[in-house]
């Protein structure tokens, strides 16, 4: 059997093997893996001499490994494996002969670890001592390199298997691991601790790899053994020289491992008094101070030889110490003397923490952010703050502010440093959180420190005639941007034209100095961006200090022409934000602005090349063009804002709109014929123009249909006339190019924006918009989005839309029904179908809710009434939990309930109240009472009897059930005894169901919830 397995492994792992033969070999090995009788053969292949090929030995041992791990092996076989492997290790490792390659050592370690887990309790109690004995050529020595390596590997692997808290384990496994740790503590922990000392003593200076391995194992085991076994003078006498060795720098893995070992020792859970005692015993404050003062971390700090690995290791140690000290101080039960010691240690460690927090390398800074965050949180809670704690705030805040500054070596936004830039901005966000915490602890200090940093920088800028490091100015502006958040929390800069707070008062002074200082002309892209961002964020300053607006507008006109593309593109958006917010204060400046930025308005579409979608392509030109176009739309919207200010005469507003739009109309004419011929460049150009027209309209009026506060405001006639030309131009292009997704997308966006400037004048054009936007090429998603727009139109113009809606409903529903009936071709298509169903039903609901239901039953749309009802009832009955069916079902039941309420006539029965004198139903049109009973009511019971409908276990189904109950009660309220008699004499008998309970609940429950509860219980009893 040994030979068969060996041959199968060789064939399976030989790339030259015949595929059919290889498949047979793999199948055979799969059988071997599940057959415990083959384990002996596999173990023989691993241990035999002469040795088999490495892959044969590795696979064979893996099969054994798997059998032990999955416990598919009896105790007797386990003991046999133990004896054979023990003998193999003794022959191979204890003798110091040629050992196995690393991959085999790893697999052997894993197998032995699984044997430890299975037999250490009973069967191999001497496991640890046996492998320690292989570490020396003579009894009690540790001079056998291969034996020591295997012993340390096993100790590390045992920890990972039974004590690593980062690995989630099942309950039984956790229980087993607790027992094994207890057994190790009772039997072998003293032996293990002594072996650490022996190995470090013998191999220190002889083999750094062994010393490093030992330190890492100590760091692991210290978390679950008695701390005194490691923290004693003998071990420390060995550790301290390792921590302090090689002070002049250079990579030293042993030194880093020794510091990591201290870090793990400090991290061990223990009582506060014991933790303080250990930190003092280890004299960690002095140890860390000496490391910081060593040439490796001090003299070489600002050089390329700086030992970042060492710095990160020491930073991690400091982070753990400070974190533990904060936890002790947060514990209200800690004894006063222990608290006093913790406070003293915190005073010692804070400068050490801030040293690493201020490190030029952000990775090192990030290492101590967790403990600094914990400290700041503790200080925020410790109110009122004792003087000792208050004194900590200033150095912490100063360190945070300084860390916000760009490094002296950084070059802003160079192409090859964009990743570094993104990482730095992410660090700034983390630092901002820390800074906010300081503000929460002591706002007055925060205001003073930041005011000083910002004010002194502005003063230096003035004194040095603008000759200042851009990094310092960027820091001041960044802090100014953050500083203003205090004013936002307090309700803004001004209250009744006066500063709302001390912080607001300071920010107002800063804003004035910033605008007056000439910073806007400082020649650096970072400064230009910061300046604009601040102006936009604190626009309310300019509402009160209007004298600065012309100056800042002039600066923005300069920024929108900036030579740096990042500044230029961002400025287009910020310029729009600025003028939109201040449209009431900018005055009649449209003509000047339009003349100043007219050179930026021409649109130039760039068609993506075929390889732009290739993942391997690094050409970002198309993305850049797309970003630039989207930013350019902000210029059009900004012009719309400026042109429509209250101080600009209406005639002038119309002229400005015409001035901008006429070139766009001409551009459409130039490109339309080529676009109709399929020219992608021309089509995309028209797409851009349509978007630009919509953006200009949005600038003139950002009102959307349905906004109650402005719904009654009619657009000015002169402006409506101008933008009616825009609507005609867009429709002209859309009708010619409705097969183009890009053109439809642009037109749909502009449709909603033109509503704001055209109002009811858009309504007669709706049929043309629908014809263009809902073409045969339109996707379900497009139709759903347009229905969502129509919801707003119906709501916003419900008094004026009746006739238009009546005329467009049939063609609209034809397109919707056609799309609903199309087969689903994939997951995305299914999602779009679900969205279309919801939007279609919501649109019908909006019509009914806005007293426009008559259009659904008008003579013009009568032919579509029955298909409408069929679609609604069909969607109500579709309750499988996929493709959003349940959400659509809920809306469909709501639609039927609305129809019952609107067309069912007056209420003749009230649930919860007896019918004293029966009154016949009086539906809005004849026969609708019977329609409710014969068409709507059966839908409810089809759903209730559908096995896919499970309101007992599914929240969405339960929601559908509630709507269903509402429909049943609505039918009863409109038809009264007619419905009850139908249920008693016809419906329930034909089903063979006792419906008396249902009828009783429907008639007597004052709310639908009672009936829904009855139906839920009925379904529970049926289940």
Swiss-Prot record:
GO MF annotation terms:
small GTPase binding; tRNA binding
Its chief place of residence is: nucleus
Give its localization.
Nucleus; Cytoplasm
Which InterPro entries did the record assign? ARM-like, ARM-type_fold, Exportin-1/Importin-b-like, Exportin-T_C, XPOT
- What GO cellular component entries does it have? cytoplasm; nuclear matrix; nuclear pore
Per the record, the GO terms for biological process are: tRNA processing; tRNA re-export from nucleus
Q: Name one Pfam family in it.
A: Xpo1
Q: Which UniProt keywords apply?
A: Cytoplasm, Nucleus, RNA-binding, Transport, tRNA processing, tRNA-binding
Family to which the UniProt record says this protein belongs: Belongs to the exportin family.
**What's its job?**
tRNA nucleus export receptor which facilitates tRNA translocation across the nuclear pore complex. Involved in pre-tRNA splicing, probably by affecting the interaction of pre-tRNA with splicing endonuclease.
What is the protein's given name?
Answer: Exportin-T
